């Protein structure tokens, strides 16, 4: 079974979708959760695909159960966010990519996929890089986001989704941010939003509290981060390719 079931009709025109799958540093997950919360986005749809974990999730403020992968919408901003509360392996991501493709085409959705690249934390802010397929290449350039400057690859579920975009000739954007692989990294998520998502979408998102709430966010995401570390290669991440493999 593969379907997207609408929960609350929201009118959007050629929207941009932000991918929030958990990966290294939980950068995409933190950024997506922040967008949903800060922008007061509407729970628009649920995603049902065979490869996704068959679990029900709940959040502390509500007794309502939900599926683990959901789509939120902000009609006034033509923005969608794909929120996932569980790690998703590459096999499941391949099914998910096929599941989402028709829906993306039907609604003229442009996806932005988020990944972290492992780096040692220093004093300077994390670097952000952009990649694209189709019109996504020009979108990254027009937003002033630099290419990585070296060969590399994106693995895990985000890599599968980007690969599907390449194979099918669809437009997509990939954002890669330097992050701490050992802990959830709100600073890297802040960079994704402020220097990547904002210029690409034109949506203004307050991000200062991401740094102010670093310890709170890390504690809340610690258990999921441990599960992602245990998953190893299944985590979404970018990494450079050396000359010799």
Regions found by a protein language model. Give the residues of each.
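N-terminal catalytic or cofactor-binding beta/alpha core of small enzyme domains
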Residues: 1-107, 167
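Short beta-strand segments
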Residues: 19, 82-83, 113-115, 176
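Gly/Ser/Thr-rich loops at beta-strand to alpha-helix junctions
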Residues: 21-26, 88, 116-120, 181-183
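Catalytic cores of processing enzymes, dominated by hydrolases/peptidases
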Residues: 120-196
């Amino acid at each position: 079974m593969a379907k997207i079931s609408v929960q609350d009709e929201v009118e959007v025109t050629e929207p941009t979708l932000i991918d929030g799958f958990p990966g290294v540093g939980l950068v995409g997950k933190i950024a997506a959760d922040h967008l949903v919360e800060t922008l007061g986005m509407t729970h628009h749809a649920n995603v049902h695909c065979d490869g996704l974990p068959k679990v029900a999730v709940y959040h502390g403020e509500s007794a309502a159960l939900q599926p683990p992968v959901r789509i939120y919408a902000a009609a006034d901003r033509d923005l969608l966010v794909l929120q996932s509360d569980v790690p998703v392996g590459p096999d499941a991501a391949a099914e998910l990519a096929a599941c989402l493709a028709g829906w993306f085409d039907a609604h003229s959705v442009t996806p932005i996929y988020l990944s972290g690249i492992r780096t040692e934390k220093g004093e300077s802010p994390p670097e952000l890089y952009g990649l694209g397929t189709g019109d996504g290449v020009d979108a990254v350039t027009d937003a002033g986001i630099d290419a990585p400057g070296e060969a590399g690859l994106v693995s895990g579920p985000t890599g599968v989704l980007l690969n599907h975009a390449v194979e099918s000739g669809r437009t997509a954007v990939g954002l890669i941010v330097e992050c701490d692989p050992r802990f959830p990294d709100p600073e890297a998520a802040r960079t994704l939003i402020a220097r990547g998502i904002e210029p690409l979408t034109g949506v203004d998102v307050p991000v200062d509290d991401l740094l102010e709430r670093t310890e709170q966010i890390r504690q809340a995401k610690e258990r999921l981060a441990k599960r992602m570390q245990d998953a190893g290669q299944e985590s979404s991440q970018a990494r450079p390719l050396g000359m010799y493999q």
